[in-house]
């Protein structure tokens, strides 16, 4: 089926009729939160915030991380997440990552073997921390 669709597209010369909107780069600007104008989308944390978060991470025995701190899928906005991964690695804490985006980022940046546990189940991880049980496991046990 896929080959048929592709062949039909080629036969109708749709490549020249279909248009897309794209961006080859997003401009990176640094600002403090109090000077962000309405309508501006914040996409990552900056160096000062990484430094601030690091103060809380260093010396912790256990860190549970759920959610990247920026849109780390884009190279221009991976700074915060990548640097938090490095701080977590160096902290010596037992680090538990919960959530698909955080897990994917840690693995993409080469940290998959540096943390105690990585789970793609963000909501399930939070549920387990809150309730000390998981709905799926409870159903199996019954």
Listing of model-derived features with the role each one plays in the protein:
Residues 1-142:
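Conserved catalytic alpha/beta core of Sir2/sirtuin-type deacylases, generalized to analogous enzyme cores
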């Amino acid at each position: 089926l896929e080959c048929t669709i592709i062949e039909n597209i080629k036969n109708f010369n749709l490549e020249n009729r279909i248009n897309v909107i794209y961006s080859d780069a997003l401009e990176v600007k640094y600002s403090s939160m109090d000077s962000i104008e309405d309508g501006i989308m914040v996409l990552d944390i900056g160096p000062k915030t990484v430094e601030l978060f690091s103060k809380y991470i260093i010396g912790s025995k256990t860190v549970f991380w759920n959610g990247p701190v920026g849109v780390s899928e884009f190279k221009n906005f991976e700074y915060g997440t990548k640097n938090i991964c490095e701080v977590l690695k160096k902290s010596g804490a037992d680090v538990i990552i919960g959530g698909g985006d955080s897990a994917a980022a840690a693995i993409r940046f080469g940290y998959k073997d540096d943390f105690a546990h990585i789970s793609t189940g963000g909501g399930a991880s939070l549920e387990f921390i809150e309730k000390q049980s998981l709905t799926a496991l409870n159903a199996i046990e019954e």
